[in-house]
């Protein structure tokens, strides 16, 4: 049994409340949790962006706007926990320490944002360190890491494997797939480098792709690792 930390983008799980993918993700998360310890960090998605946009129009400062966004991530996390039922720990973890403690239950642990100015990708990267994860997975809207935005550059190169240093180089150039806010931010990339925990980046718009990649090694994805040790399937 391995420990897996998932950064599940809000734009993937709940792009819009009426167009959420929660039902489709339930059997996928349960299948993975049947074989491994699973921690999920949920992003804010369209809901968080909408609230933050309104807050800015009202002249609310950035720190408070971030706190509003964090509340939305926790609301999304609460919805996922309720939908998972007995498979999940019944409370949203509000710190890395809480998440680690809740993990002792062997149930799926779900959390949202923690600190203003920090993305849920960064939260997940630190959580991976705290729980000594075997793999950190970023579930996003593209099938891995590219040297340029593949949506605007058809000839962009997909990286099946790369080192943490190569990842940082791409992030610092602003060339991560659909945009660093959708694939990985630079803080999370730095944490990946220091932790030496393998990172997997995959497309989560088709939920079953997550279990296919992690449990069966099927599909297209990117692996960031400081060693040549085989990461997938788990």
UniProtKB/Swiss-Prot annotation:
Catalytic activity: UMP + ATP = UDP + ADP
Activity regulation behaviour: Inhibited by UTP.
Functional pathway: Pyrimidine metabolism; CTP biosynthesis via de novo pathway; UDP from UMP (UMPK route): step 1/1
Swiss-Prot/TrEMBL GO biological process terms: 'de novo' CTP biosynthetic process; UDP biosynthetic process
Any GO CC annotation of this UniProt entry: cytoplasm
Short name of one Pfam family: AA_kinase
Disulphide bonds in the chain: none
Listed InterPro entries: AceGlu_kinase-like_sf, Asp/Glu/Uridylate_kinase, Uridylate_kinase, Uridylate_kinase_arch/spir
EC number annotated for this UniProt entry: 2.7.4.22
Family affiliation: Belongs to the UMP kinase family.
HAMAP family: PyrH_A (MF_01220_A)
Protein name, per record: Uridylate kinase
Organism this protein belongs to: Methanoregula boonei (strain DSM 21154 / JCM 14090 / 6A8)
